[in-house]
Amino acid sequence: MKLPEAIIIDGKECLDILCCKILIWEANSDVIEINDPDENKCLVIRECESIEINDTYKKLINSASVRFPRGTVIKRTITSENIEKEGATTVYTERLIDGTVVEKRKGYSTAQPTDFKVGQRIRIYLGYYKDRGKVFKNATERLQAMEKEAFVKNVPDFDGYIVKCSVSTPIEIKCENLASGLKRKNVVKLGPMAVTVNNLLKEGGKYDLLRGTGLKLHPKTAERDINIGKIQLTEDLTVADVLTEWNKYGLYSFIRKDTDGTPYVMVGHTY
């Protein structure tokens, strides 16, 4: 395996280290959470075998897959008080069924398929940390420095839901973005009649198809009030079905986050 080449910064050799932070928690059925959950109230994973993210404005529902090797460590609920009280006794080893000896910490455990459920929220952060050879006091200080640099914008590279999880090793979870919920919202019977995007999707609009999904129509799309033409809808169709069908006519729907992280459905033509 070829090692990464060092780069020179301020006369010192540095290595770019790719960092990841994956947050997994129970979804709120009423709203789509914008802020990250407290790390003491979710699963936190900082190591994986591979991450693949497929993201394009030409698809409403984008996807991601994450693979975890045997022995991947998950951080579970743990408080600073626990750490202070337990001290050095927080580190111990555990022998797995296959004979592997794993070092573990109180509040941490190795990943198991049962840790992941369909419908859970997942947020993936990726970024680079430049290793300048600095010596840190402890692992916590090093982790904080790495994440401060790697995730400086604090913008996730993927935000969505778990839709499938393998039961074998390595563990692999399949995910879909925040538009995934639109596959569970059926439309109303309509037409044939002429409609606009605002009629169908705008909050307070005539049909308001996004109501109850946690998503709203992007203000910039609402300003344009795009004319769809004459359409007919049946109750067996979902909102995702309708928005995806528009792709055939060069009208694309995709998720776009505002500066504060609020997710919107944006609709527009390609030119």
Predicted regions and their residues:
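Polar/acidic, low-complexity leader/linker segments enriched in S/T/G and N/D
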Residues: 1-49
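Short beta-strand-centered interaction patches in the first periplasmic/extracellular domains
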Residues: 2-5, 13, 134-153, 157, ...
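Hydrophobic beta-strand residues in large extracellular and virion-surface proteins
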Residues: 7, 20-24, 51, 64-66, ...
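Short linear proline/tyrosine/threonine-rich motifs used for host-factor recruitment
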Residues: 7, 13, 76-77, 90-95, ...
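Acidic surface patches and DE-rich sequence motifs
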Residues: 9, 26, 36, 85, ...
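Short beta-strand/loop turn elements enriched in aromatics
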Residues: 40-83, 87-88, 92-93
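Surface-exposed or flexible loop/turn and strand-edge residues in extracellular/cell-surface modules
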Residues: 61-63, 119, 228
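Surface-exposed cap/loop segments at beta↔alpha junctions
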Residues: 67-69, 73-85, 95, 100-216
